[in-house]
Amino acid sequence: MGKLANQVAVVTGASKGIGAGIAKALAAEGASVVVNYASSKADGERVVKEIIEKGGKAIAVQADVSKQADITRLFAETKKAYGKLNILVNNAGIYKFAPLDSITEELFHSQFNLNVLGLLLTSKEAAKLIGPDGGSIINIGSGISTMLPPNTSVYGATKASVDAITGILAKELGPRKIRVNSINPGMIETEGVHAAGFAEGDFRKRIEAQSSLGRIGQTDDISPTAVYLASTDSKYLTGETIRVTGGLL
């Protein structure tokens, strides 16, 4: 039996990238996984298919986790399918980099609505469903919150908020045996990184030069930490932020 046998996990933004990698890793350890996606049903169902083909259990549920009504429905469908919740991975998020003179209200609110408000509302609903035995909430932050590169003031502020929220919710939810921790990745090679043009060229070379390990990360560099935080291996760990950056300083 895997480390997460008989556990139920919701992973937001799990149709690709880091979220998909975490969803598959949790399922491989025995968890029943709710693969949340915002827009691409095909991508969500592809992740579910991969999990089921390897003997795991999963369903795909559409929800825009910046909207309360969608979040409520996400957890209602989780309860209907599996009857409970043990693990939440707050992975859904967006990033739009811009210098100060290009910041707009839309750029600010779109990122804060999903990366911060969405994370809070999702955590609120998850905490209602997690039972008296407790559980684990895992927030996906970013190494940018401490690296502070130029042109990331809005995105970096959302992820600094995640750092703070992680510690605060750990204190609020600790009496209910709900642990709250954060994983702050460095640059990870995902579909989004490729689409943004960061996976090749000078930007990638600069990150690789700054990395102690001399490379950017892959999704399977992040998922083992998520499994650890979801399992009883980390039963005395809460309120912590774990940087998984390949030594980016």
Language-model-derived ranges and their functions:
Residues 142:
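Residue(s) in the substrate-gating loop at a strand-loop-helix junction
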Residues 99-100, 107-112, 207:
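Substrate-binding pocket helix/loop in short-chain dehydrogenase/reductase
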Residues 128, 171-175, 235:
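Alpha-helical segment proximal to the catalytic Tyr-Lys
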Residues 123, 158:
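Active-site helix of classical SDR
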Residues 147, 227, 238-249:
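Short C-terminal tail/terminal secondary-structure segment
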Residues 8, 15-17:
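Conserved glycine-rich cofactor-binding loop
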Residues 211-222:
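A conserved structural motif in NAD(P)-dependent oxidoreductases
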